[in-house]
């Protein structure tokens, strides 16, 4: 059997005229040049060709490596499902500031200064390093300035600067983390203030600043109290009674306070 195209053989088997004689079929198969060629095929060959073609039809169609599917004609092979939503996370508990014992937190004097628009300068004495946040400084500035209509300035427009750069820490201690001398407490630090869009000093704040300045100028140190002082006070029983009362209040123990009173009094007498 000569080698011919599969479709050509199929067409010839189905539609071409045939002459059956002595168990043989004669088919006219067209050539590529337009002429026809007559070949003789036995019935066994016909059965083989039909079985071969049916085998080819049952096999999957092979596609080229660069074949592209039309997305409008090809449906999804798997159903499209939305991702499962996670359960909502519980809200974080709000942090409450616990009052610290007196003397447990180091303090510092904070000077806030705005060079222009508005020209503002004030101080916050005895400011705790670890508990005072940058937000607290913004609140202090916000209380002293207003916009052109007399309304409060938004906190987003108030910027706190340190060494001419916006601060990045949340508390004063974090801002001064690289300055251990200031973190020791008892020092002074100056922060710059910048208000986006400008502002003006509030009338109440200006009056308060002037009153504070006048109060400082008119301040006179109190005169010393007239009366016994020094060793003459220690020699009195009233002094030791007061000392014992203080110790009882702190220790909650009368016997221990009395014992310490005697011990301190004997030590004081032995110093002469």
From Swiss-Prot:
Positions of region (Disordered): 1-35, 85-105, 212-231
Domain Ubiquitin-like, chain residue ranges per copy: 108-198
Key word Plastid present: no
Gene3D superfamilies membership: Get5 dimerization domain
GO cellular component, one term: cytosolic small ribosomal subunit
UniProt subcellular location: Cytoplasm
Predominant location: cytoplasm
Keywords linked to the UniProt accession: Cytoplasm, Transport
One protein family per Pfam: Get5_C
Disulfide bonds: none
Self-association state and partner proteins as the record states: Forms homodimers via its C-terminal domain. Component of the get4/get5/sgt2 sorting complex. Binds directly sgt12 homodimers.
Record's comment describing the protein's domains: The C-terminal region (residues 201 to 272) is involved in homodimerization.
Family, as annotated: Belongs to the GET5 family.
Function: Component of the get4/get5/sgt2 sorting complex involved in the GET (guided entry of TA proteins) pathway that leads to the insertion of tail-anchored (TA) proteins into the endoplasmic reticulum. Get4 and get5 form an obligate complex that catalyzes the transfer of tail-anchored proteins destined to the endoplasmic reticulum from sgt2 to the cytosolic targeting factor which then targets the TA protein to the ER membrane via get1/get2.
Full protein name: Golgi to ER traffic protein 5
Name of the gene encoding the protein in the UniProt record: get5
């Amino acid at each position: 059997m000569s080698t011919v195209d599969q479709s050509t053989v199929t067409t010839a088997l189905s539609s071409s005229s045939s002459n059956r004689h002595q168990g043989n079929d004669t088919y006219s198969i067209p050539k590529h040049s337009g002429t026809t060629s007559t070949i003789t095929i036995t019935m066994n060959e016909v059965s083989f060709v039909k079985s071969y073609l049916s085998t080819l039809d049952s096999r999957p169609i092979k596609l080229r490596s660069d074949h592209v599917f039309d997305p409008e004609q090809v449906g999804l092979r798997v159903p499209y499902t939305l991702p499962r939503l996670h359960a909502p996370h519980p809200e974080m508990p709000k942090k409450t500031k616990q009052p610290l014992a007196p003397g447990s937190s180091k303090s510092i004097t904070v000077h806030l200064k705005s060079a222009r628009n508005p020209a503002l300068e004030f101080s916050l004495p005895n400011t705790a390093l670890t508990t005072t946040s940058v937000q607290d400084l913004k609140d202090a500035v916000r209380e002293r300035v207003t916009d052109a209509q007399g309304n409060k300035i938004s906190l987003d427009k108030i910027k706190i600067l340190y060494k001419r750069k916006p601060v990045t820490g949340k508390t004063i201690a974090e801002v001064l983390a690289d300055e251990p001398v200031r973190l020791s407490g008892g020092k002074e630090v100056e922060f710059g203030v910048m208000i986006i869009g400008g502002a003006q000093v509030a009338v109440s704040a200006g009056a308060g600043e002037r009153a504070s300045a006048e109060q400082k100028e008119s301040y006179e140190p109190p005169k010393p109290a007239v009366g016994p002082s020094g060793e003459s006070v220690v020699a009195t029983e009233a002094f030791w009674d007061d000392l014992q009362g203080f110790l009882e209040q702190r220790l909650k123990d009368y016997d221990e306070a009395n014992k310490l009173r005697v011990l301190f009094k004997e030590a004081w007498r032995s110093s002469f």
